[in-house]
């Protein structure tokens, strides 16, 4: 499983299939330290390609799944509803360059949160 936060880019090669986990923040003890408000969790999510190199086809993205139990992402144990996962599949002739994925989640209080995830496709 690959782990990314919203502040970093992720490098992959052509023909790769990766399960990706995204930590949406910590919301413990009434302190807002991440993108989620204290006590809030993710209800649903969607992922799409928002930018890509000229002439490139979109990589294949699975549906977004909200974690229903504890999940470690980047060394932090995310409680249920604090992280999402999806599968990224790149084609054998995927165009090299930077892709920007747009993750959109809706929280249990009805708030919509959007995060851009940077994906660099290169030769490995």
What are these regions (language model features)?
Residues 1-38, 121-123:
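Predominantly extracytoplasmic/ectodomain segments of secreted and cell-surface proteins
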């Amino acid at each position: 499983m690959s782990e990314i936060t919203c502040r970093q880019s992720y490098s992959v090669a052509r023909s790769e299939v990766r399960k990706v986990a995204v930590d949406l923040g910590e919301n413990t003890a009434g302190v807002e330290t991440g993108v989620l408000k204290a006590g809030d969790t993710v209800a649903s999510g969607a992922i799409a390609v928002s930018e890509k190199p000229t002439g490139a086809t979109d990589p294949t993205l699975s549906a977004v799944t909200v974690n229903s139990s504890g999940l470690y992402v980047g060394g932090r144990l995310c409680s249920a509803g604090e992280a999402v996962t999806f599968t990224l599949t790149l084609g054998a002739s995927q165009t090299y360059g930077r892709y920007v994925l747009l993750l959109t989640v809706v929280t249990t209080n009805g708030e919509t949160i959007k995060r851009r995830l940077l994906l660099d496709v290169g030769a490995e």
